[in-house]
């Protein structure tokens, strides 16, 4: 893991903590505003603003039936781009059975 940033941006850190909580603790059920607020120690109004912003970008989605939030498809697409950028998965660097 990377070292802690010298000048962290608190809002970004809170948004990432929220995404990590949804990823690790809620499964397909998602989480409500109160649950996220309690789990992260963040005020409900801040959680609402974070959720609204993350939903706008497609990183989370809200179930209209349950009013709970879960990870969205845009976040999945971001994750898919990681292997393409990681040298461990760079096929050009793998040894070829045809090279001498």
Cite the ranges covered by each PLM segment.
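N-terminal helix-turn-helix
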Residues: 2-83
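Conserved segment of winged-helix/HTH DNA-binding domains
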Residues: 74-100
């Amino acid at each position: 893991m990377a070292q802690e940033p010298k000048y962290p941006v608190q809002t970004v850190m809170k948004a990432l903590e929220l995404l990590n909580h949804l990823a690790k603790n809620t499964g397909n059920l998602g989480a409500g505003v109160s649950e996220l607020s309690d789990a992260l120690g963040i005020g409900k109004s801040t959680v609402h603003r974070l959720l609204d912003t993350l939903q706008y970008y497609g990183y989370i989605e809200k179930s209209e039936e349950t009013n709970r939030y879960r990870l969205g498809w845009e976040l999945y697409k971001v994750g898919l781009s990681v292997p393409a950028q990681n040298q461990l998965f760079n096929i050009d660097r793998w040894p070829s059975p045809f090279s001498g």
